[in-house]
Amino acid sequence: MYTKWNHKIVLFVTIIAVSTLAVSAQMKVWSVNSESRLTIITDKAVERQSFPIDFKLFDLNIDPLREQLFSVVDQNARQRPTVIQLPNANGDIEYFEVYEDSNFEPDLQAQFPEIRAFSGRGLTDKYATLKLSISPQGIQTMVFRTDTDNEFMEPYSQDHNTYAVYKTHRDKGALPWACSTEDRGLLFDTKSKARSLAPESSTGEVRTVRLAQSCNGEYANFFLAHSAADVALVLAAFNATITRVNGVNEKDLAIHFNLIAGTTAVIYYDPLTDPYTTLSSWNAQEQAVMNSNIGAANYDIGHMFGASGGGGNAGCIGCVCNDANKGSGITSPADAIPMGDNFDIDYVVHEMGHQLGANHSFSWSNEGSGVNMEVGSGITIMGYAGITSQDVAPHSIDTFHAGNISQIQANLASKACPVTTVMTANHPPVLVAVPGATIPISTPFALTGSATDPEGDPLTYQWEQVDQTTTSGNASVASPTKATGPNWLSFLPTASPTRTFPILPTILSGLFVTPTLPGGDAIANIEALSSVSRTLNFRLTVRDNHPYVAGSTTGQTQFSNTIVTVTSAAGPFKVTSPNTGVTWNGNSVHNVTWDVNGTTANGVNVANVKISYSSDGGQTFPTVIKASTPNDGSEAILVPSVNSATARIKVEAIGNIFFDISDANFTTTNAPVRSRADFDGDGKTDVSVYRPSNSTFFLIMTTNGFGGMAFGNPGDVSVAGDFDNDGKTDIAVYKPGASASFSVFKSSNSTIANTSLGTTGDIPVVGDYDGDGLSDVAVYRASNNSWNVIKSGGGTSNTVFGSPGDLPVVGDFDGDGKTDLAVYRNGTWLILQSSSPVNPLVTNWGLAGDLVAPADYDGDGKDDLCVYRPSNGVWYIVNSGGGYAFYQYGLSGDVPIPGDYDGDGKDDIGVYRNGIWYIYESTSGVAIFNFGLNTDVPIARQYQP
């Protein structure tokens, strides 16, 4: 596999290189059309009611495109692809790797070599898959997208030189169309199979189904075909429609329709003499035409296209390969325009889906088929989106419902007629089974799958409810009190394996019910969290989106079922605070609260929860505040230091699937920028000294000027820090002795706080050990190498770290906002990082006799290792962001005083020499201040005994 994969990569790169050169050497294929749309004579298909309002226009130079495409047909079809460019609905050009995907049996293809079909995979967008048809009349395309709308392209101008590219927004409601296929007389027991929904995957085979396609005279005339001499015009139209039909079938079902050569015998050109009379008679008339003109042994499925009448009828369900009625399916639009995306997908794929074995999937009418599993009108191919009184949307999506896929798979498994080709180049995805869960009522939840693909194809995931309805009409829509049947609409596959229930906008609005999609009926709610006990059955469909290649390979699917049990004995589980537009300052402590409501028992049994933070209004939750905390309804958290007016909190069950998100945005702010010895809170280190002889602090503050304050007693040790989280350094001292203590003068309220901690010989090591933005009082006890901390947020810690003779060092070396435990041992640093407190980080940096001066010199939020060597006045720095720095700045006897004196977020080097400050600011160079006595202690200097 490794060698094969690398061969693919080499081949792929070669193809890209060769094709790119070929494209650049040719005339430009696509150009933006700059004409006024009012001046363009449009193709008659543009007149259809479902033609989109929003689209992009491009002019096509078709000859070089045709040359590229035809380089990989016939004998080259399986050997190599080509690379082409196509415009998208955003107005950009994309690259596709393209293979031939003929819809004609070889004899028919040989007769009409100018009519071709191709499949492709996106190179610009790896999730994109392409279906393209080409003929002398031009091209049509369909691009399947992921996490955005599918796209179509078709001729816009009458001369077919200008093309419209648009996103799928089909509106069937304006057209009086209905499928009249009835559920009676099934040729295969689709009901019992649908109810079981046993986990199945694609079989690793391509099924090629022989299609006999007929049409009446009105259809042929629409495409300007009036006699057998014009047969190519009709075949080109068939080809365009079947290309799109195959796009859906190949992706979901691994089925490919091939038009048989005998199709030309059932194409009719004169409406007055063709065998088709009234719409209600077409099914039987078509079957007779197929039997007499083609013969039952020569085709597997037969279908007929009309141009008007507004209806479709498969004539049967699951009758493919059954001689009695396999040739009785019909499709005819109401607007006399039998082409375009709505005709191809909403009508033709729907009716052929019946013939393959699929029933209707809607629940507005309960047909009792076992697959009435969609809310209201339904939205997948076998639904009725846009044509009921319970429309969940005005148009369908381009996938089969999981229940219908299961029906068709089971039906074809019992049939011998499709030609099956075992694939060696593609295999079904490998899917991990998803366990079930019991959840509380009225509480959001999420289902997550996990799958891999043997060939590395880009996988997509689709979660769907698979409960048969027991209601109909207005009772078929989603409702919190609905105890059975569908409550969750199907959505298009996504690249994410997770689906949240309900959709995120509903959750963020604090609602339990998702209203109808734009254009749907007001009554047709599409999602509802259950407020009653019930069972929900879900199926995950994973698609590998592999393109069809010349009958040898196509897309594969894999499935997993799971059961979610909703119990009214618990819930709702709900975040209660923050739930309004409050403001929480970064690095402050606040309580997150939630209603537990019986979720620790009652079969839900969630003992712990995870708390996460979002700064983008709940779209993502990248910040985990508490990885695990008891499910007790309240937790004090440290607010992330992030500026956001759209913050949200998420509390989610551990070991279960339910969660809740706070209902309203709230505001968080950045924690104040903390520079050492910043007494006025302006983000700059202030020139300041402590005079031990009289316990007086002298300050030159950059914004408030000179200040002084006597605090403490002679012999006390300065231990300045921000003890009240106001962004300003507080005056504080450590009183050594047998009953040592700390005394703090808080700048926020001018109060004094005294804390007893320490004994003779202890070294004060003030720092923010719990990361709450407040300095904690702490001592290092050299007698037993223990760090003793009283945390501002509550609690104490006692950690043994170090050896006799070590020098304790204070710093945040991993940038997590918490002070790490660190010691310096004769040139060796040992750091126990708070983010990884298992094995200490050991680094040799320095010599015995060096003075440690850790600080954030590169401004990355992490303190850097640094020593100042008195013997030569050199600073030796290891930047945490990478690299080293060396500075000759100082003399023997100088005291290193690093700090951010210019407020640029980077600590500057500096020395204190007999009352004179020599600072080398990173923004403006040398600054010298005469302030203090030679016996004073610069407060910027970390205390060292």
What residue ranges belong to the model's regions?
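Extracellular acidic, Ser/Thr/Pro-rich low-complexity tracts
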Residues: 450-455, 467, 544, 595-602
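Exoplasmic/lumenal beta-rich domain surfaces
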Residues: 258, 462-532, 603, 610-612, ...
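Proline-centered linker/hinge motifs at extracellular inter-domain junctions
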Residues: 426-430, 434-435, 459, 540, ...
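The catalytic-center signature of Zn2+-dependent metalloproteases
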Residues: 260-282, 322-398, 464, 468-479
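Proline/serine/threonine-rich low-complexity linkers at boundaries of modular beta-sandwich domains
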Residues: 412-430, 564-572
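Fold-level signature of zinc-dependent metallopeptidase catalytic domains
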Residues: 27-40, 162-320
